[in-house]
Amino acid sequence: ADIAVVGGAEAIIHPLPVAAFAQMKALSTRNDDPEHASRPWDADRDGFVIGEGAAIMVIETLEHAQARGAKIYGTLAGSGISADSHDIVQPDPTGSGQASAMRKALASAGLSPCDINHVNAHATSTPLGDTAEAHSVAAVLGKATDQVLVNGTKSMTGHLLGGAGALESFAAVMALLKRQVPGTINIEHLEEDLEVNVVTHTTDLPNGDLAALNNSFGFGGHNVTLAFTNANATH
């Protein structure tokens, strides 16, 4: 197809699913301070915060977009999928499955780690998940790790579950378009020995070609990474 409408939505705040996630001990218990409960990579994080919302995008071939005079926000350059099946809930601490998805996305897009400027991380604010993802991102980026701006938008939106991937993809595209990466909020004490460059305030991206990865990981070890470039990139 030349054009498609894609996205995700979630409205799950109901006693039954909330109780299920609570029983898994996946949710933050910071009930006395909910505005600051979602805190990816903070040393005192204790679980995710459920959010609700939606994001819808139109994706199409460049020729189709130009023919109808559409405003082009960015380019979906590549994608990668993996399934590590480590555990039904807990992430693989080695991050090997996550790294596989990221490497496949880079290969699909024809990009190298040194081309990446930004990673919009899955970063749910869970003790195990954030550390595992930081490890996998660093493993993929290698020597380029320190130059790549990593953020966690779930600190601001909560975890939209089925809507998270679409919303965070759009956030990554807009970061490239605006040449600014929004900071991760609610970090009071950054996790020690963190392997990636987490930004805690809005940070400018350089001029020229830009590229970003967006990670979305799920229970059971299924991992998806999308690679985006700015609209006029010549990678």
Please identify what each model-predicted range represents.
Residues A1-H64, A164-H235:
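Conserved beta-strand-centric core segments of catalytic alpha/beta enzyme folds
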Residues A4-A9, K71-S79, C114-A121, V148-K154, ...:
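Beta-strand segments within the central parallel beta-sheet cores of soluble alpha/beta enzyme folds
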Residues A9-V18, P113-G129:
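Conserved beta-ketoacyl condensing-enzyme motif
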Residues D32-A109, H118, A233-T234:
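Condensing-enzyme catalytic core mediating Claisen C-C bond formation in acyl metabolism
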Residues G69, A109-S112, L141-D146:
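Short helix-capping segments at alpha-helix termini
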Residues H86-Q98, T124-L141, D146, L160-L167:
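Short glycine/threonine-rich loop-to-helix capping motif typified by GTGT followed
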Residues A101-A109, S136, V140, A172, ...:
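Stable alpha-helical structural segments in soluble proteins, enriched in small hydrophobic residues
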Residues T153-M156, S216:
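Glycine-rich, charge-dense phosphate/pyrophosphate-binding loop(s)
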